[in-house]
Structures are given as structure tokens and as C-alpha cells.
């Protein structure tokens, strides 16, 4: 059991036979009345998002989540295919289950798939990935010492902010949890 006061982004719990993932949370302590936790929850299986408030002392059933490292193979436009490295079984996933991770995944990269009662519901990219910059505007000469950022499109199609000195065709390391540039490789 976990306390509602301990809810954080990414926490999973079971309620009414469904598993929920906390998308947003806010601890509210009004001047008058009891404190409460306002949350935005995503149903891990259906993808439906709901807003719910909890008493911070309320107890929630922790969901048993299985994590499995799988290899991203390809997409056919609608489904994204991942392969289990032990059984070589392929599982297709809809875009709504991979939307956060797919921005940073290339074919043949490994990702962590989360399962609840045998059904995949979420994909996590590795914390750091190395990706090629497919397009960015050239930086102006003399602007390399400042902390100014510019948009860059990665080989996966994601757009992130990079420093001015980073050029098209270079490989960079990206933190997939925040979507931020880390360093040139």
C-alpha cells in the first residue's frame, strides 16, 4: 500500500481493477480545511486521462508492474514492433503507448516495456541516447560562448534545443527524461 501523499509523476497504482499512472500531481494545503492531493491520472490500459483528488492519508494499492527490456524493430505506420530478446516474440504497440519514447528511439535500440497483468501499457526509452542532428540552422560566428539555444531536428524526427555551436550532421547525447541536449559525442 502506498499513501496518496507519496504520489509522484510516474507512480503506478491499482484502483477498481484498473492500473493508473500519475501524470501530474499537486499537494494543496488551503488556509482553511484539510490538505489534499490533486492528481491527473492516466489509465494505463485505455489511455483515458482523469483528474482526481485524494486525502493525503488515503491508502492506494500499489500495482505490480513487470518491466522487460525489448528491442525496437520497426513501424508499419500504425503499429510499433518490439522484440523480446529471450523468446524472440514480437509485440505490436499503438502510438499512444509509445508516444513519449518513440521520439528518441531508432530501429534496433533497446527500450523498457512496462506490463500489467501481461498487457503492455508503456514504453520507456533509455535515459540517455546518442542521435544524429538531421537539420539545424548554422550558428553565427562569434556566438559560441553565450548560452543561446537554437532548435534542431534529430534523425528520429524529434525537435530539441541545442547550443549555437552544434551543427547539422553531428551526433549528440540527449537526456530522454527531459528531452534536453547533454553534450556532443
From Swiss-Prot:
<dbReference type="InterPro" id="IPR020599">
    <property type="entry name" value="Transl_elong_fac_P/YeiP"/>
</dbReference>
<dbReference type="GO" id="GO:0003746">
    <property type="term" value="F:translation elongation factor activity"/>
</dbReference>
<keyword id="KW-0963">Cytoplasm</keyword>
<dbReference type="InterPro" id="IPR001059">
    <property type="entry name" value="Transl_elong_P/YeiP_cen"/>
</dbReference>
<dbReference type="InterPro" id="IPR013852">
    <property type="entry name" value="Transl_elong_P/YeiP_CS"/>
</dbReference>
<protein>
    <recommendedName>
        <fullName>Elongation factor P</fullName>
    </recommendedName>
</protein>
<keyword id="KW-0251">Elongation factor</keyword>
<dbReference type="InterPro" id="IPR008991">
    <property type="entry name" value="Translation_prot_SH3-like_sf"/>
</dbReference>
<dbReference type="InterPro" id="IPR015365">
    <property type="entry name" value="Elong-fact-P_C"/>
</dbReference>
<dbReference type="Pfam" id="PF01132">
    <property type="entry name" value="EFP"/>
</dbReference>
<comment type="similarity">
    <text>Belongs to the elongation factor P family.</text>
</comment>
<dbReference type="GO" id="GO:0043043">
    <property type="term" value="P:peptide biosynthetic process"/>
</dbReference>
<dbReference type="InterPro" id="IPR014722">
    <property type="entry name" value="Rib_uL2_dom2"/>
</dbReference>
<dbReference type="Pfam" id="PF09285">
    <property type="entry name" value="Elong-fact-P_C"/>
</dbReference>
<comment type="function">
    <text>Involved in peptide bond synthesis. Stimulates efficient translation and peptide-bond synthesis on native or reconstituted 70S ribosomes in vitro. Probably functions indirectly by altering the affinity of the ribosome for aminoacyl-tRNA, thus increasing their reactivity as acceptors for peptidyl transferase.</text>
</comment>
<comment type="pathway">
    <text>Protein biosynthesis; polypeptide chain elongation.</text>
</comment>
<dbReference type="InterPro" id="IPR012340">
    <property type="entry name" value="NA-bd_OB-fold"/>
</dbReference>
<dbReference type="InterPro" id="IPR011768">
    <property type="entry name" value="Transl_elongation_fac_P"/>
</dbReference>
<dbReference type="Pfam" id="PF08207">
    <property type="entry name" value="EFP_N"/>
</dbReference>
<keyword id="KW-0648">Protein biosynthesis</keyword>
<dbReference type="InterPro" id="IPR013185">
    <property type="entry name" value="Transl_elong_KOW-like"/>
</dbReference>
<dbReference type="GO" id="GO:0005737">
    <property type="term" value="C:cytoplasm"/>
</dbReference>
Amino acid at each position: 500500500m502506498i499513501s496518496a501523499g507519496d504520489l509522484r509523476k510516474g507512480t503506478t497504482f491499482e484502483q477498481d481493477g484498473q492500473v493508473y499512472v500519475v501524470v501530474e500531481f499537486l499537494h494543496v494545503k488551503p488556509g482553511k480545511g484539510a490538505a489534499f492531493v490533486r492528481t491527473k491520472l492516466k489509465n494505463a490500459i485505455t489511455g483515458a486521462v482523469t483528474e482526481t483528488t485524494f486525502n493525503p492519508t488515503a491508502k492506494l494499492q500499489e500495482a505490480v508492474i513487470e518491466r522487460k527490456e525489448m528491442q525496437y524493430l520497426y513501424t508499419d505506420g500504425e503499429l510499433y514492433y518490439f522484440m523480446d530478446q529471450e523468446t524472440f516474440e514480437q509485440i505490436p504497440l499503438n502510438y499512444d503507448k509509445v508516444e513519449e519514447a518513440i521520439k528518441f528511439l531508432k530501429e534496433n535500440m533497446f527500450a523498457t516495456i512496462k506490463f500489467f497483468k501481461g498487457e503492455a501499457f508503456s514504453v520507456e526509452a533509455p535515459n540517455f541516447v546518442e542521435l544524429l542532428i538531421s537539420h539545424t540552422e548554422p550558428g553565427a560566428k562569434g556566438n559560441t560562448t553565450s548560452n543561446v539555444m537554437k532548435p534542431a531536428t534529430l534523425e528520429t524526427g524529434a525537435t530539441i534545443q541545442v547550443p549555437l555551436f552544434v551543427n547539422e550532421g553531428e551526433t549528440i547525447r540527449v537526456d530522454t527524461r527531459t528531452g534536453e541536449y547533454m553534450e556532443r559525442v
